[in-house]
Amino acid sequence: MHRFKPFLTAILALGLSGCTAMAGEGRSPATYANPVLDTDFPDPAVLKASDGFYYAYATQTGKGAATLNLQVARSRDLVEWKLLGDALPNKPVWARGTQDFWAPHVSEHAGRYYLYYSAKPDAALTDSARGLCLAVATAVRPEGPFTDIGRPLQCGTGFVNIDPMAFDDPETGKRLLYWGSGFGPIKVQELGPDRISFASGSKPVDLVHPAPSEDPAEYGRLIEGAWLVRRGGWYYLFYSGDNCCGPKAHYAAMVARSRSATGPFETRALPAGAPGNVVVGQRGIWVAPGHNSVIEDARGDHWIVYHAVDSRRPRSSEGDEVNTRRIMLIDRLVWRGGWPEVEGSGPSSGPRPRPVVR
């Protein structure tokens, strides 16, 4: 989830495209250090495109006098990233007057790119009962520009319809869409062959439910940001909770697993359907890490790509008490007993071996 309130909306600032963001210190040709993208880049979703580049997509942000609806960056190695600008430069016709464009995910099929995201419809400006919508846009290039299909995929109340992630299940051949928040469960539903609508007769299935707790070590009050990975006969559902932003941000990435892409899911410590099992949590200077994607490198290692807040510079600008500055980090996942972990259970600091890429 992202809460962004721009100070000024304008055309893209001159010179934005092609700029390289500063990243972690202490690197050598064989190492990297977090962050890999030291600019506000919330909810990062990474795609390895057929052109050989990695693309990262992120939630709306402000860059100087400009507002980027959905950000896109490109890399050859998952470490050095170049900001490319706005993947969705033109707002959809049903959300011209709003500013909430969140948590994109892009998939590639038959030479076409599908961008799934969430946005607040114009109707919500006059009707407080209206919440965010799931949406789809398409493009012929991974960097865009993406064009919305002209209608929401699904709308509802509050923040229920956010954080979509598309996944093609190799076992069943089904095209699936995961989403969810708003203090409700993570859901999945089958997409139709066109990938821009739900399959006829399909219904959403609840997968993992929030679990309110007074324990400050727990993160299950609100869960969001689904990402699915298949490995060794298991499907791993990553998700995050429970408060991404603000002075009291309290957030971590978690995981559950299942033998089926549509559940039931279990965690290491709790019964099926309950959240738990933190993969990466607060550590050192890094606060509120989460809302991750996962990408596999050329050696077969899995890397978790996520945002976190640098406690030394937590705000987007001086005097800004609204927008939390969430920057992009990566860490290698290690697998122990069939479960993924990050060494030290939190973001790394200092030099680490780079991902292996071709």
Where are these regions (language model features)?
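Carbohydrate-active catalytic/glycan-binding domains of CAZyme proteins
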Residues: C19-R358
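Bacterial N-terminal signal peptides that target proteins for export
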Residues: M1-L8
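Bacterial N-terminal signal peptides
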Residues: T9-G18
